[in-house]
Amino acid sequence: MTNEIRAIFDRIAPVYDQLNDWLSLGQHRIWKEMAIKWTGAKPGDTCLDLCCGSGDLALRLARRVGSTGQVYGVDFSANLLETAKQRAQAQYPQPHISWVEANVLDLPFEDNQFDAATMGYGLRNVTDIPRSLQELRRVLKPNAKAAILDFHRPNNQQFRTFQQWYLDSIVVPLADRLGVKEEYAYISPSLDRFPIGKEQVEIALQVGFTSATHYPIANGMMGVLIISK
């Protein structure tokens, strides 16, 4: 299963950013900045961005921690990491980011290493959510926070119907024109499988986080889980 998901993200790498704009109605940048603020990351911190994709969230984190800080962007898709590296190389001054190809279920870091962490649109796609949160907790310093941003199924039936219409009528046809229809058809079933907010809170507490709060945004079509070690 992990290899299948990795293959999907390797194939969609060239159009990943464009489709994220469509999936979020262009709002993902605002939500990413909100997530970073909630982590409490500050200049000089060492931060982690899991499932970093094309690097957008990691680059934003790097701006927050500045020249005295360090960010590690982790993803298991080599193609997406290459896109992230190219984006970083095009910036001046060069952001302090190390790109790491790894699985979030087995992070190549020491315990208690990071001051803050983010994960954008990744938790829904991991094969073992409790295990990924355990690993995240392991590498965070005591009292450190993480913000996990992702798409969700809204509780409200009207918004749920709109979300499904939007996916079927806008996103998947766009993906088809870009040559990745089959790859983006996975989104709807992944939303159906994804634990709702209160279930995410329960999982986070069960694996040892001292506090966990889930905030629905965009009428429940998006949410951010804030967890503290």
UniProtKB/Swiss-Prot annotation:
Reactions the enzyme catalyzes: demethylphylloquinol + S-adenosyl-L-methionine = phylloquinol + S-adenosyl-L-homocysteine + H(+)
Protein's pathway: Cofactor biosynthesis; phylloquinone biosynthesis
EC number: 2.1.1.329
One of the GO biological process terms: phylloquinone biosynthetic process
One matching Pfam family: Ubie_methyltran
Alphabetical list of NCBIfam families matching this protein: MenG_MenH_UbiE, PRK00216.1-5
Function of the protein: Methyltransferase required for the conversion of 2-phytyl-1,4-beta-naphthoquinol to phylloquinol.
The protein's name in its UniProt record: 2-phytyl-1,4-naphtoquinone methyltransferase
Organism (species): Trichormus variabilis (strain ATCC 29413 / PCC 7937) (Anabaena variabilis)
